[in-house]
């Protein structure tokens, strides 16, 4: 396993995460508002569900490729370029008011290219660290990059414009160019004599046989169901309450994430993983409960808690897998996490939350307290499941601190 020994290597990993998150947020946070501004509100739920559908297909395939066939850095480069190209096509179709079904088809192609990126980049970074506990400070730069993308969109004044897609596409091209400065990891072992089951990465499903692995996968998946409503609908709620630069205000979510990420290294050294997960899940419940009060102050507090919940649950899950799964399965384990979270969780969430939002709309306006209150209830049920199911035991010495 390669180790991060030089400052130059550390800077490379930091830049990788920063640019990737900046590109992702510039598009993700503004997408819902762009669709609304161009008369495409009717397809919003399906547009976000495209990401979930893609997560069933491409992460495991490309994760297996990065484990066995092609150096992960090269996989990341070509996927970043494919993301930039398809994002430009989507933005052009929206700008010129093309048929909504063509726009949805292009969004699906974009999602297929984009879905594996976080898992692969995380596997690249983790493979170069001597200790997975070092991951949190580097992952912090992804949080700062996400904030930078939100602020960039608002500074450019393109919160509701298809131009936000062109800005994000440019950042993906920059990321692809930057990968040429990353030293490639060791070329994966030969793919000879592999079954199609293994070539498609489906053997990663065997990880679910382990009880604690299964609980972690299921917990993050279930939490993604209410979480999927955050970016499609929180900016709309902000604008309804009078916040004009919603994308910039959404960056408050990353303030608590910065604090949580900065604290995660210490927490991993002093707390059991179980208590870190529980703390993150509690923040998840409070995030929606405070939003349900539906005043400017409480909604902003709810938005702010999003980041702490995300870091303590989802980033800890990535570190958990790196500690508890053999290194030869690293990319596939992260890919399976992407499939479960962004696939199963988000697909149920985007479609279900689209229905739930419609059910909360009245002739007098959206019943935001009812909407967010329902999501707080779901998050509380996820917390109860984790408390009842997680044991924190496993097969190797690293499990003792879980």
Please name every model-derived segment.
Residues 1-7, 182-219:
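Juxtamembrane intracellular "pre-TM" segments in multi-pass secondary transporters
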Residues 2-55, 212-251:
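Helix-loop boundary and gating motifs at the non-cytosolic
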Residues 18, 86, 99-119, 221, ...:
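Hydrophobic core of transmembrane alpha-helices in multi-pass small-molecule transporters
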Residues 57-71, 157, 259-273, 357-358:
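Helix-to-loop junctions at the C-terminal end of transmembrane segments
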Residues 81-97, 282-294:
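C-terminal ends and interior cores of transmembrane alpha-helices
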Residues 90-94, 172-186, 343, 371-402:
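Multi-pass alpha-helical transporter architecture, strongest
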Residues 108-141:
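Cytoplasmic helix-loop-helix junction between adjacent transmembrane helices
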Residues 155-172, 354-379:
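A membrane-interface helix-boundary motif in multi-pass transporters
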